[in-house]
Structure formats: structure tokens, C-alpha cells
Design a protein with these regions (language model features):
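Alpha/beta enzyme core
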Residues: 114-127, 131-143, 152-229
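Alpha/beta catalytic cores of nucleotide-metabolism and tRNA/nucleoside-modifying enzymes
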Residues: 20-39, 44, 50, 164-166, ...
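Active-site beta-loop-alpha junctions enriched in small/polar residues
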Residues: 43-45, 69-71, 105-107, 132-134, ...
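Glycine-rich, positively charged N-terminal anion/phosphate-binding segment
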Residues: 24-30, 43-118
Length: 358
């Protein structure tokens, strides 16, 4: 495994110019495997291969979607995909055995199609398209959620990618409800679903909403009723109770967990346990005991320490502890102890003193 690329590095990887769509195979539908129930969300700058590894060890996740790989006007070399999604070097799975689907971000149908074809050659679990990123730098270049202002462009991108990818490889997409408002939500969803996508994840907020609550799960229900492909609900699922309410309101049994899973690594397992008839755990507490999670925090640090540049290491551990402290008093104490620390050696000493050896 190798470190992920920065956004700048991704944009600077230039090799083969993109061509046209004429050589792509005609798409013919085949039987697809049943969709999973709980997905782990792509989160740029947070949920990279290191945290995917740790969270999938806890369990309960059926599939992950990677952070985005930016596609501009070139055919990227294979090493770009494997740097961002090193699980591709492990058969497309995390070390816990959970499938990972690479996500592409761009606005050029030709280049997205060519890059999708290339990544499909090393990604047995499909290709995902990003139509929801709210980052200003992405939107200024016409990518991510900016595409939700142009349903007709979505209706060009999705079929181009679908034709370029072998028929047995799934193509999915993730969208928000819209850019400045949700007026085009159904039109965008229909453009995606009717163009050959196998699955659609809907983050139940607009770009303008950002990450502010609430998530409008009822709009996911509207989309689910309007399209004929599986629709996955995403947004503001922090607890088992949230998951149950989201399913009820959205009409979707499929959930994508993001910040809720980073905050409570046992959330997916807790949802499954509740589905199986277990009593929900107390709200406001972590779904797995701190003594169970602490060794994984140590493993996370070891991965960060060995894979990332020294200047990024302390920040990554503090970033995760900042989420964990919402559920774990012990994480609050750890975060406060390390809050002003940037020296990896000092962090390593703290880990050695506080995390039991396996």
C-alpha cells in the first residue's frame, strides 16, 4: 500500500489524451448481484484507505466507495488509481475482505469513460461517479455537485461510462438533491437511472445545504419512487435510531454511512444487531466498548505513521479522535492530550504509553 495522492498531484498526472466514444462496446444488461445493505461513504480528506481498513475490521459494512479520483482531459496511468485506492492491489478489497469501489470525478464524458474503462480492468466491484462533491474548487471546474445544474450532461456522462465498462462491472453514482436547491432532483436522478447506472446513492441535502442538518430523507423517497434502480439513502445517520427513521422516511433499506461511522465505528454492526432483534444500545455512547476500539486506534496510528508523510501524521490521528470524542470520554481525554502536538515522535510515545500491545 502507498499513500494517497493530493488533489494537486491527481490533477498533474498526465499521460494519454482522451479520444472518442466510437470504439466502446455496446452495453447489454446482465444479471447483477443483489445490492448490499450498508455502504461506507467516500469522504475526501477523511475516509481514505487507512480509515477504511480500520472501520471495515470492526465489521458490518458490505462495500466501501473510495474518495474521488479527479479526471480532467487525460487518461490516467494505472498507478494513480492504485495510489488512491491501494485496495485494488488486494483484489479490490480491504484487508478485512470488504469490497471497495473506486469513485471518479469529472465533467468530460469522453475522459470519464476512458478512465472508467481503465479502472474497471483492475476493479472487480465496479466504478462510481461523483455528482455530489460540494467543494468550491471542484464546483468551479464544473465537477461534483455543479453537474446537478445540467441534467442533460449527466445523461451524456452515465451512458458513456456504461458503454465503456464491461457489462458485468456495475456502474453507480452518488448525487446530492441539487446545487442551490432541489428543483432538479428528480430530473437528475432520472437522467442517471435511465442512462444505465446500476445504483444511485442520494445524499439528502443540496450543495448549498453543505453538511448542515437536517437531511431531507423524504426527498430520497420521491427519487426512489421515480426511478427503477436501487436507491441508497445517505446523510445524518449518526445512530441506530437515525438509521431506522431514515429507512422509514426514505423508503430505502440501503444506507450509506459517513461521519456517523467515523464517530461510532460500531454503528454498522449495531444497525445489523437491531435488525436481528437486539435491543438498541444507549444513545450517545459508542456501539463498541472503548477497550475494544483502543487497539484499533493504535493500529490506525501505525498505518498513518508508516504510510503518510510525517507532517500529516499527528493531524490524522487528532482528526479521528475529534470525531470519536462525541461518543467516547476516553477519546476526549486523548484528543485534549494531543491537541497541540504535531511531532510524530511525541504522538508515538503517547500511543506506546496508552495503547496496550497486542
Amino acid at each position: 500500500l502507498t499513500p494517497t495522492l493530493s488533489q494537486r498531484e491527481r490533477g498533474q498526472e498526465k499521460r494519454t489524451p482522451c479520444s472518442d466514444l466510437s470504439s466502446y462496446q455496446k452495453y447489454s444488461s446482465l444479471d447483477k448481484p443483489a445490492p448490499p445493505t450498508i455502504l461506507l461513504a467516500p469522504m475526501e480528506g477523511l475516509l481514505d484507505f487507512v480509515l477504511r481498513d480500520i472501520l471495515t475490521r470492526v465489521g458490518g459494512v458490505d462495500r466501501c466507495v473510495s474518495e474521488f479520483i479527479r479526471v480532467s482531459d487525460t487518461l490516467l496511468p494505472e498507478r494513480v488509481f492504485t495510489r488512491v485506492v491501494p485496495e485494488l492491489l488486494n483484489g479490490g478489497r480491504t484487508f478485512a475482505g470488504v469490497p471497495v469501489r473506486p469513485q471518479l470525478l469529472g465533467s468530460d464524458a469522453v475522459c470519464l469513460a476512458e478512465n472508467a474503462a481503465r479502472v474497471a480492468g483492475i476493479s472487480p466491484f465496479g466504478v462510481d461517479l461523483n455528482f455530489g462533491c460540494p467543494a468550491k474548487v471542484v464546483n468551479r471546474h464544473g465537477g461534483g455537485a455543479a453537474l446537478l445544474q445540467e441534467p442533460e450532461l449527466l445523461a451524456t456522462i452515465v451512458p458513456a461510462v456504461r458503454r465503456a465498462v464491461p457489462a458485468h462491472i456495475p456502474v453507480s453514482a452518488k448525487m446530492r438533491l441539487g446545487f442551490s436547491d432541489a428543483s432538479l432532483a428528480l430530473e437528475c436522478a432520472h437522467a442517471i437511472a435511465s442512462s444505465g447506472a446500476d445504483e444511485l446513492v442520494v445524499h439528502a441535502r443540496t450543495k448549498a445545504d453543505g453538511y448542515r442538518p437536517p437531511a431531507y430523507w423524504e426527498r430520497v423517497a420521491d427519487i426512489g419512487a421515480a426511478v427503477s434502480i436501487p436507491v441508497v439513502a445517505n446523510g445524518e445517520v449518526w445512530t441506530v435510531d437515525d438509521a431506522l427513521r431514515c429507512r422509514a422516511v426514505s423508503g430505502s433499506h440501503m444506507l450509506m454511512l459517513g461521519r456517523g461511522m467515523v464517530t461510532d465505528p460500531g454503528l454498522a454492526l449495531a444497525i445489523r444487531a437491531t435488525d436481528a432483534g437486539a435491543a438498541p444500545h444507549a444513545q450517545g455512547q459508542g456501539s463498541v466498548a472503548w477497550r475494544t476500539l483502543l487497539p484499533l486506534v493504535g493500529d490506525f496510528w501505525q498505518l498513518v505513521h508508516s504510510r503518510l508523510e510525517p507532517r500529516a501524521q499527528a493531524g490524522r490521528l487528532k482528526q479521528w479522535l475529534n470525531f470519536l470524542r462525541r461518543r467516547y470520554p476516553e477519546a476526549e481525554a486523548a484528543y485534549m492530550a494531543l491537541r497541540t502536538v504535531n511531532d510524530p515522535k511525541v504522538v508515538a510515545a503517547w500511543v506506546a504509553a496508552n495503547v496496550p500491545e497486542r
